[in-house]
Amino acid sequence: MSEVTTAEFNEEGKYLRKIRSFVLREGRLTKGQAQAIESQWPTMGLDYSPTPLVLSDVFGREADTVLEIGFGMGASLVQMAKDAPAQNFIGIEVHKPGVGSCLSDAAIAGVTNLRVYHHDAMEVLEHAIADGSLARVQLFFPDPWHKKRHHKRRIVQAEFAELIRRKLKIGGVFHIATDWEEYSEHMLEVMQAAPGYKNQSSDGTVVPRPDHRPLTKFEARGHRLGHGVWDLMFERIA
């Protein structure tokens, strides 16, 4: 097993240190997930290296590239890749069954424009993604760490926003979604204060769910129960 680190920040979003947050668990794979990893990793898997990817080499073409941090089981990421064949997609996930499920779904869907990391997202972003190379970064339903004493563990902080800004092209978009209203308010505060971004919301708050983000079964059930989901989209302008 590989140990994974993640950044910790203070209340002002100042980087403090890297902490051991969890272990990159093998997880309990189904037979289908294990088979998908074995058969699909050679073509869709990306082995981490601390040198920037040459995206045109990875995908065999020049195209806008979308990166998703923490894709879970991967169903929505595969759907996005299928719906937008002219774009390239990279997903990062630490949970191995999720990686296996994503690769299985991708193979069934026949997508060729998707690549996957099984690694810590902070390391991938810092070292394996070139500055100014991404058209969109997606962070959907990150852990809200709702207890106040855990807020410093929230991924959306000032230095993280700056890291994402560096990786986006001018005109690229950081798209965040959460089902925790207080976290959406925290995210909005962080992003409004982050230099080099422009909120794509007409009223300076959140945006309606864009067509490119699929409506998940979990989210649809939440809507029926009256639960909200908040989307934020910030464009890199400098």
From Swiss-Prot:
S-adenosyl-L-methionine binds at E68, E93, D120, D143. It is an enzyme of class 2 (transferase). Keywords: Methyltransferase, S-adenosyl-L-methionine, Transferase, tRNA processing. One of its GO terms (molecular function) is tRNA (guanine(46)-N7)-methyltransferase activity. It catalyses: guanosine(46) in tRNA + S-adenosyl-L-methionine = N(7)-methylguanosine(46) in tRNA + S-adenosyl-L-homocysteine. The active site is at D143. InterPro entries: SAM-dependent_MTases_sf, tRNA_(Gua-N-7)_MeTrfase_Trmb, tRNA_methyltr_TrmB_bact. The keyword Methyltransferase applies. Its EC number is 2.1.1.33. Signal peptide: none annotated. Pathway: tRNA modification; N(7)-methylguanine-tRNA biosynthesis. GO terms for cellular component: tRNA methyltransferase complex. Substrate binds at K147, D179, T216, K217, F218, E219. Gene3D superfamilies: Vaccinia Virus protein VP39 (3.40.50.150). Belongs to the class I-like SAM-binding methyltransferase superfamily. TrmB family. Catalyzes the formation of N(7)-methylguanine at position 46 (m7G46) in tRNA. PANTHER family: 3-DEOXY-D-MANNO-OCTULOSONIC-ACID TRANSFERASE/TRNA GUANINE-N 7 - -METHYLTRANSFERASE, PENTACOTRIPEPTIDE-REPEAT REGION OF PRORP DOMAIN-CONTAINING PROTEIN. This is tRNA (guanine-N(7)-)-methyltransferase.
